[in-house]
Amino acid sequence: MKVLLLEDVKNLGKAGEVCEVKDGYGNNFLIANKKAKLATNEVINKYKAEAKKKAEKEALEKAQKLQMVETLQTITLTIHKKVGANGSLFGAITKEEITERLKEQHASLNLDKKDIELKHPIKSTGIYEIEVKLGSGVVGAFKIDVVAE
């Protein structure tokens, strides 16, 4: 019996492969547990079409993320905060505050606070480089300029 694996199966194969298995193993374990489907031409073609569509969607998303990184690299975000006598801020600048200011000044960029990586808390004025991880291995950075009010 030939089956198309829907997920990786130990000692048999990886998802998307067509494997020859015994009838009992195929029907009673693989197909019953939705780990495989009976490998007909229709099922194989449908699986290949879905895989192709998924790959195209992932490529489009990655291209959009790369475009966002290029845009981010040109940005210098300015944040005005109250400062004490010694030049330190009252409180720290948070990821949430950075995303809010980014949305205010650059509405086209839609970043979530979980995408921003702060290496250390920002507690004084100056220019800082903020790292952004957008997923799919796409990493970028932009600068923020913290100035006294």
From Swiss-Prot:
It holds the Pfam family Ribosomal_L9_N. GO terms for cellular component: ribonucleoprotein complex; ribosome. The keyword Membrane does not apply. Gene3D superfamilies: Ribosomal protein L9, C-terminal domain, Ribosomal protein L9, N-terminal domain. GO terms for biological process: translation. GO terms for molecular function: rRNA binding; structural constituent of ribosome. InterPro entries: Ribosomal_bL9, Ribosomal_bL9/RNase_H1_N, Ribosomal_bL9_bac/chp, Ribosomal_bL9_C, Ribosomal_bL9_C_sf, Ribosomal_bL9_N, Ribosomal_bL9_N_sf. Belongs to the bacterial ribosomal protein bL9 family. This is Large ribosomal subunit protein bL9. It comes from Helicobacter pylori (strain HPAG1). The gene is rplI.
